[in-house]
């Protein structure tokens, strides 16, 4: 535990922020023992706080970041660097992008520095079997070692799963579950835990809304389910909630409503993977629970294959006129 005792959080944050204004892509190489310390200390804080967070507005809510570190810095420039604003992130900090390490290290550092004002939920990519494949493992191995990746896994296994803002806005990474009858079921999930292949915890991190589904449907991802508008309406009514806020899918404008504005999808990585022209968005919730959106436009850049149509990923939501 010596790593925790001598952790200089202010110095770590300062070095991570020094690349502001640099050409995107410049790395920040923290010492391995500093990163280990971030994992150990934040893990302690995650376990000391509930698995179902109860938060108060005002706060800003962000969706997937996926290792797009310079876009994370843009989000903070737009919304205010902590502690200027309170934040809730909905998961998927690592994989796909080039700088998962900087991204997760800054987020964990802010969690340690401002434990009551800065909150991180678990996404489906904060799971060893997923981030072993989609980039984070390789980044850890290339820049440090596999042992450090395992230390992150121990930290991710303790992240909270869901949050409720002022008893009215239910937040999670993926979506609803056919197994979810009572909030007490979420509170009873014991940590540390891996993400199972099915069941409540899996669904909260993996499920997706689908306007063409009545009730529950099969998910094209091969994991969890899809759910229709009626499922959303019933859930909100039963639990006296106003809104579900989730991430997990690329949306063209950075945010997209579903089920008569009873659910919103947030995605905060603009130009996702360099392949999409999507914007990124952050949702600001004020003291009256009015929600507004701050948009990060996709960076203007010439694409090498500008004429070639891009294959959309599974789960891409396209804007369609409501019938």
Curated annotation (Swiss-Prot):
CDD domains in the record: MPP_PP1_PPKL (cd07414)
Record's cofactor remark: Binds 2 manganese ions per subunit.
Family matches, as InterPro entries: Calcineurin-like_PHP_ApaH, Metallo-depent_PP-like, PP1_catalytic_subunit, Ser/Thr-sp_prot-phosphatase, STPPase_N
Gene3D superfamilies according to UniProt: 3.60.21.10
Listed GO CC annotations: chromosome, telomeric region; cleavage furrow; cytoplasm; cytosol; dendritic spine; glutamatergic synapse; kinetochore; microtubule organizing center
Region (Disordered): 302-323
Activity regulation, short description: Inactivated by binding to URI1.
Location of N-acetylalanine modifications: 2
Tissues expressed in: Isoform 2 is expressed only in testis, in the late spermatocytes and early spematids (at protein level).
Active site, per annotation: 125 (proton donor)
Keyword annotations: Acetylation, Biological rhythms, Carbohydrate metabolism, Cell cycle, Cell division, Centromere, Chromosome, Cytoplasm, Cytoskeleton, Glycogen metabolism, Hydrolase, Kinetochore, Manganese, Metal-binding, Mitochondrion, Nucleus, Phosphoprotein, Protein phosphatase
Binding site for Mn(2+) 1: 64, 66, 92
Tagged with keyword Ribosomal protein: no
GO process terms (BP): blastocyst development; cell division; circadian regulation of gene expression; entrainment of circadian clock by photoperiod; glycogen metabolic process; neuron differentiation; positive regulation of glial cell proliferation; protein dephosphorylation
Keyword Nucleus recorded: yes
UniProt: Mn(2+) 2 binding residues: 64, 92, 124, 173, 248
Catalyses which reaction(s): O-phospho-L-seryl-[protein] + H2O = L-seryl-[protein] + phosphate; O-phospho-L-threonyl-[protein] + H2O = L-threonyl-[protein] + phosphate
EC annotation from Swiss-Prot or TrEMBL: 3.1.3.16
Post-translational modification Phosphothreonine, affected residues: 307, 311
Localization terms from the record: Cytoplasm; Nucleus; Cleavage furrow; Nucleus, Nucleolus
Family note: Belongs to the PPP phosphatase family. PP-1 subfamily.
PANTHER family in UniProt: SERINE/THREONINE PROTEIN PHOSPHATASE, SERINE_THREONINE-PROTEIN PHOSPHATASE
UniProt subunit comment: PP1 comprises a catalytic subunit, PPP1CA, PPP1CB or PPP1CC, which is folded into its native form by inhibitor 2 and glycogen synthetase kinase 3, and then complexed to one or several targeting or regulatory subunits. PPP1R12A, PPP1R12B and PPP1R12C mediate binding to myosin. PPP1R3A (in skeletal muscle), PPP1R3B (in sliver), PPP1R3C, PPP1R3D and PPP1R3F (in brain) mediate binding to glycogen. PPP1R15A and PPP1R15B mediate binding to EIF2S1. Part of a complex containing PPP1R15B, PP1 and NCK1/2. Interacts with PPP1R3B, PPP1R7 and CDCA2. Isoform 2 interacts with SPZ1.
Function: Protein phosphatase that associates with over 200 regulatory proteins to form highly specific holoenzymes which dephosphorylate hundreds of biological targets. Protein phosphatase 1 (PP1) is essential for cell division, and participates in the regulation of glycogen metabolism, muscle contractility and protein synthesis. Dephosphorylates RPS6KB1. Involved in regulation of ionic conductances and long-term synaptic plasticity. May play an important role in dephosphorylating substrates such as the postsynaptic density-associated Ca(2+)/calmodulin dependent protein kinase II.
Protein name: Serine/threonine-protein phosphatase PP1-gamma catalytic subunit
Species of origin: Rattus norvegicus
């Amino acid at each position: 535990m010596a790593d925790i005792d001598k952790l200089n959080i202010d110095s770590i944050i300062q070095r991570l922020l020094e690349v502001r204004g640099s050409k995107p892509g410049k790395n920040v190489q923290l010492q391995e023992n500093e990163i280990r310390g971030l994992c150990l200390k934040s893990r302690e804080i995650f376990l000391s706080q509930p698995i179902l967070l109860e938060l108060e507005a005002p706060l800003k809510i962000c969706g997937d970041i996926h290792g797009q570190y310079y876009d994370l810095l843009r989000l903070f420039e737009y919304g205010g660097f902590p502690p200027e604003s309170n934040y809730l992130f909905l998961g998927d900090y690592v994989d796909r992008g080039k700088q998962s390490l900087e991204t997760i290290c800054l987020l964990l550092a802010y969690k340690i520095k401002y434990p009551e004002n800065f909150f991180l939920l678990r996404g489906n990519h904060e799971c060893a079997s997923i981030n072993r494949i989609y980039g984070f493992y390789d980044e850890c191995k290339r820049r440090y070692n596999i042992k450090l990746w395992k230390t992150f896994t121990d930290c991710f296994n303790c992240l909270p799963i869901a949050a409720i803002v002022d008893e009215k806005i239910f937040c999670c990474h993926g979506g609803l579950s056919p197994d979810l009858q009572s909030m007490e079921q979420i509170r009873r999930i014991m940590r540390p835990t891996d993400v199972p292949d099915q069941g409540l915890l899996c669904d909260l991190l993996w499920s997706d809304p689908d306007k063409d589904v009545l009730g529950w449907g099969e998910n094209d991802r091969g994991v969890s389910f899809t759910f229709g508008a009626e499922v959303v309406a019933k859930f909100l009514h039963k639990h006296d909630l106003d809104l579900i806020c989730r991430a997990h899918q690329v949306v063209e404008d950075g945010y997209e409503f579903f089920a008569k504005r009873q659910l919103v999808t947030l995605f905060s990585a603009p130009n996702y993977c360099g392949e999409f022209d999507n914007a990124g968005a952050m949702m600001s919730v004020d003291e009256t629970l009015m929600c507004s959106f701050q948009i990060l436009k996709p960076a203007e850049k010439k694409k090498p294959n500008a004429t070639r149509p891009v294959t959309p990923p599974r789960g891409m939501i396209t804007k369609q006129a409501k019938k």
